[in-house]
Amino acid sequence: MKSVTLKDVAKAAGVSYATVSRALSGSPQIGSDTRERIIKLCDEMGYTTNYVARSMVMKKTDLIGLVVPSIDNQFMSELAYYAEMSARAHGYNIMLCNSGPDLKQEKTVVKILLGRQVDGILIVPQSPKTYENIKAYTDQVPTVFVSENLRDQPQSYVAADNSRGTYIGTKYLYDLGHRDILYFGRRHSTTHQLRAEGYMKACQELGLKQRFYNSEYSRSSIAHGYEMAKELFSHPIDYTAVFASTDSNALGLLKAADEMHISIPDQLSLIGFDNISATSLPRLELTTIEQPKRNMAIQAVDMLRDKIENGTQGYVHQILLPTLIKRSTCRAL
Amino acid sequence: MKSVTLKDVAKAAGVSYATVSRALSGSPQIGSDTRERIIKLCDEMGYTTNYVARSMVMKKTDLIGLVVPSIDNQFMSELAYYAEMSARAHGYNIMLCNSGPDLKQEKTVVKILLGRQVDGILIVPQSPKTYENIKAYTDQVPTVFVSENLRDQPQSYVAADNSRGTYIGTKYLYDLGHRDILYFGRRHSTTHQLRAEGYMKACQELGLKQRFYNSEYSRSSIAHGYEMAKELFSHPIDYTAVFASTDSNALGLLKAADEMHISIPDQLSLIGFDNISATSLPRLELTTIEQPKRNMAIQAVDMLRDKIENGTQGYVHQILLPTLIKRSTCRAL
DNA sequence: TCAGGAGTCGCAAACGTTTCCACTTTTTTG
DNA sequence: CAAAAAAGTGGAAACGTTTGCGACTCCTGA
């Protein structure tokens, strides 16, 4: 269990441990013969440099804190995957924290991460209030937000262009011949407000009537989409397509439609948003708008690295374009 | 960016920094009046203890390395969720690594984790060869494996009782009246061998004929399940139920069945394994065997903590019972 | 022969903690 | 009331590394 230190290999090599350190770090001020000898010896003795000691003197941990509401969520786990890959490729490691159900938890984990001396924090906010919640810490360490739109805040973030996503989607529906399109789902939270706006903008441009259906406290879940849709379908259906603010809600609506024998897409076209993995499943095949998760993750760690390594001040808002994924829940009229 | 240290608050409080350290750590050998004064001061000055310095002297990082083939995977992200929660509740943080596509990557990240001085490692193996692959490191740090069955290896692990899972499932099918049950999918890798064994045992006890269908290099994916199933259905269907070794494969089979107008469950009952989240989706509703992921995660970190904190030697094999989730792809004959 | 420079290498400080030991002050006890 | 015990505090070492600076060796050229 006792690991071998610099001092150990120094002793074995008959040099000072400064020399060993330099040999490993590729310092130019060292003989190439001794360097090789030492490197070989390190290998034999199974020496690996102790990162916590190193961090101590370098005042840099090469650690990035990743805080997500809960990693057990398609969007976030996918994001985490690419973030970790990209970070590691650049010599960083990821410290993972679930910011749990409430803001208190979120603040706690950020505090922990600070104590751990992470070089930067990547956070996907759990609510629009997150910014205020951790404001006190974001100036102590480079931070970039992912996926929640902080528009007016002086904070770096990368996000999908939600507004453009719904715009593209309704345009697609229009081109398919639909003239009565219902927007279904959440409208509060910045993200969902933007999605609604994209729909509204498209309607305006195309001369369509804007029609919304949502309950005040709607959440993005299949169960809730189902409940909402059952309520919705109890009224006459005087629209030919619905744009769900979220894939989960769309899936819930799908379930309700099945039960009520409303055929999708024959009677009703349906389009969602997020491209969660479930949408590509057999029997589902939901047409949707994809958030470019891979790019978001990569851009986010790039931004963070820039802040860390170059000390870049200020902030940048990186907006990525979503794309339409055509599957089989929409049909031409 | 410059954070406040022990020395800073010591100066402000007019005491030595040993005293401040003691006040914070709740040492008994300190006056309760000075303790309160110091704690209040720390709060005001926004002091948080530097964990890397602390780790240095304590020779303990309170860090657990979590290595998974890829976090963007239902099973693993869910596992990671519970593991992180449980770990943090006990004062540990999680360092996340994807062990990537190959064994080389897996070895690399384990090495990194060792350099980071993690107190322990939680690893879900990417292949049966994982054990051999990282053998050299597992005796340098407490390690527990998750979900791959290392039966004969002197290594701690927690896993679902795969064999029992398939046993329960086929028994269920039998009780429903099925007498011709086909086992569909992978059979190599320890896990899947065990699953196959459970099916075989049930068949033996119940006097059923064992029937297998699989391709040599089958993987657990919907696409592959689909391909296999198309091939399968090109032969006459002289069985009334199929047990898929994996939910993903089951879903692929479902898709093929739909295309060939084979009705499930009317013509064919279907049962999967894993209870991935997709199985509970509308239109799918796959009957399956659930791995108790939450329990697995919690047990795993408990085992690891025991090794870390109590220096427990030896190894334990923790086998958890899977449960049958009845949904709508099975019907009584 | 020797000054001086290039090329190597060692010494020691520093990073921010925790904790052992010693020391001072206060309290208890005989 | 003196001595011993207890309580509270400070000094300093230690953890394993990086790196500035000084020192040493060796060689070149005058």
Regions found by a protein language model. Name each.
Chain A
Residues 1-60:
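N-terminal helix-turn-helix DNA-binding module of bacterial transcription factors
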Residues 1-5, 43-81, 89-92, 100-101, ...:
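N-terminal helix-turn-helix/winged-helix DNA-binding helices
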Residues 69-77, 96-105, 158-168, 184-230, ...:
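Hinge/beta->alpha junction and helix N-cap segments in small-molecule ligand-binding domains
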Residues 85-134:
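Central regulatory/effector-binding core of bacterial HTH transcription factors
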Residues 101, 123-168, 208, 248, ...:
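Flexible loop/hinge segments that line or gate small-molecule binding clefts
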Residues 117-125, 182-185, 215, 236-246, ...:
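Periplasmic-binding protein-like
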Residues 179-180, 210-213, 263-270:
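Short acidic capping loops at alpha-helix termini that bridge into adjacent secondary structure
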Residues 230-333:
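Flexible loop/turn connectors
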